[in-house]
């Protein structure tokens, strides 16, 4: 079994860490959890933040918290264009043909999942693992997903509610509430996001 967790990770924060830790708590026998940062258009990219920076920060998150068997996959970044989840999962399936795949997804996305490209094909490749449990049980799923309820699992998550975009909009003095010390240190050293930590 492997887990797939995608996102902008711009920057990686305690909410991401909570999802990762929850995955390993509920599925300790998994072979790996694969983090897949999205490709970010140069027109949307934050000032001074490169794909290399995001990959480095993800590696810092893994190492700082001693998270086992967690990898970073660059498949979407390498494409240099927007990727659809179905394309990414087909790549993962070709790379791990014998593994059961779980795709981690937030509750906001599960509510509009039927609008995703080839969502039925996604469910042929992977089971969905839903975090941020606003949906309490399978009877609360959107109507179009109820027939696939056997392919959808729920995972309790940490109480940290954050998004990378919301964090970027905060005063820098508040970033320590949402980022690990080593990531904050890296951001400061590299002068990312236009901020520097006060001395």
What kind of region is each of these model predictions?
Residues 1-199:
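Nucleotidyltransferase catalytic core that binds NTPs
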């Amino acid at each position: 079994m492997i887990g797939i967790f995608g996102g902008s990770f711009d920057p990686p924060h305690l909410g991401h860490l909570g999802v990762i830790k929850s995955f390993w708590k509920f599925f300790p026998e998994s072979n790996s959890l694969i983090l897949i940062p999205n490709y970010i258009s140069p027109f949307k990219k934050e000032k001074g933040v490169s794909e290399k920076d995001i990959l480095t920060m993800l590696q810092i998150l893994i190492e700082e918290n001693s998270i086992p068997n967690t990898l970073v996959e660059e498949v979407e970044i390498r494409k240099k264009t927007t990727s659809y989840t179905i394309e990414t999962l087909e790549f993962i399936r070709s790379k791990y043909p014998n593994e059961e795949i779980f795709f981690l997804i937030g509750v906001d996305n599960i509510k509009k999942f039927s609008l995703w490209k080839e969502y039925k094909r996604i469910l042929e490749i992977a089971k969905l693992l839903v975090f941020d449990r606003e949906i309490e049980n399978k009877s609360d799923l959107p109507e179009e997903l109820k027939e696939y309820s056997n392919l959808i699992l729920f995972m309790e998550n940490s109480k940290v509610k954050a998004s990378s975009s919301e964090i970027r909009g905060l005063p820098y003095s508040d970033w320590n509430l949402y980022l690990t010390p080593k990531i904050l240190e890296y951001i400061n050293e590299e002068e990312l996001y236009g901020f520097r930590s006060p001395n």
